């Protein structure tokens, strides 16, 4: 089923109902369908041909959504760019993807006449040729191209097909949001270029209303939750923490809210408990990655007595834990998380060697270290590349970070390994705080909470921690800062 078919069927069923809103502007299902037709037709009229890549860097807004689905209807491939990235980042991705056109304020195409700013986009949406835009696309052909967040190195283009898109929608409607329908409202507080965008089509095709916030502010988010009577929303853990800090950790009066979905980065158990207290039994954690978007495992609202788990596999995903030889390990044993199913990427753009390595044996090798318990719940320990080996023992930074975040004064934490002559690597931590701390007292506080080899030797206090454009703390950048500091002291 083509994207255009999904939009047209929704327009036929829910015609004049509100489909999408942002600020004072609302489009009905029919209006949204026709707007995406005009935009798709306009792009084809500019000389683009099906299969061409179109780079898009747009803020949350209705025109951005029209661009995404107009591009899809025209058989073009959307290259998703994050507006928080730099112009240099955008240029690198545009060059790497071979994009012929670009839409946004901080992007430019190699073909000047195919560079469109926000005003150009608005004009194409209004003045584009009327009529159905429906270019067929093979299920395995590229549908969109996303770039990994860059937390583990150079970002790579991830090719997602219509097959993957359908599997993601099906996963949500079967497992995460089976009861949505007309009268429901999804509040998008996170960028729709990121994980929140995954929730748009499932709500649209069921006749629900998608409401977008142009940007995230915790006070505005809480007001909008109540004003629109949101039934569902999505937050990354950083946004969740900001919201709870703003609300003062008191239970929130949002009776229509049935799902607070979260994911996209690890969450500390202490933060999940705070969120459960504030929002009630509506939390749903969804685990995925760029190569298998947001639909590997799910921790349902009624399973949050297992805070710390990433949940159980979605219906559309087969998940195993394997050793270094790709052999499945026994229940309870630790290894790499691998995934198989229709949700998977087709591969990395122009990177056949990395594609073969990551998708070997038809399984996506996630690079995440985890284990299953006897009830089939997955527990993620860390990223393979982030494991610290100190004195021959494996230290999982996430475990240490989660423990640090239990301290009431600590707001953010990153734990990394620093080269050490005796231990191979020494455990060090960087934190940002809500109030001043004495680092020696915090290190003493960790005694009894962590084994000696896991405890940081040094605790650094910084105003803020480096993050990716998606809000993930960049351990790689933290590690480099500390190593540069050590080298600077040694060279002084």
Task: Indicate residue ranges for each PLM-predicted region.
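Conserved AMP-binding/adenylate-forming core of the ANL superfamily
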Residues: 3, 8, 16-61, 65-69, ...
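Conserved adenylate-forming
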Residues: 43-48, 132-140, 145-187, 203-208
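A short helix-loop-beta submotif of the ANL/AMP-binding
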Residues: 53, 59-79, 83-87, 96-101, ...
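ATP-dependent adenylate-forming carboxylate-activation enzymes
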Residues: 58, 79-92, 106-108, 208-228, ...
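AMP-binding/adenylate-forming catalytic core of the ANL superfamily
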Residues: 85, 102, 233, 325, ...
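ANL superfamily adenylate-forming
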Residues: 107-139, 149, 154-155, 166, ...
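Conserved AMP-binding/adenylation subdomain of ANL enzymes
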Residues: 166-185, 193-232, 246
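Gly/Ser/Thr-rich phosphate-binding loop
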Residues: 205, 230-235, 244-305, 318
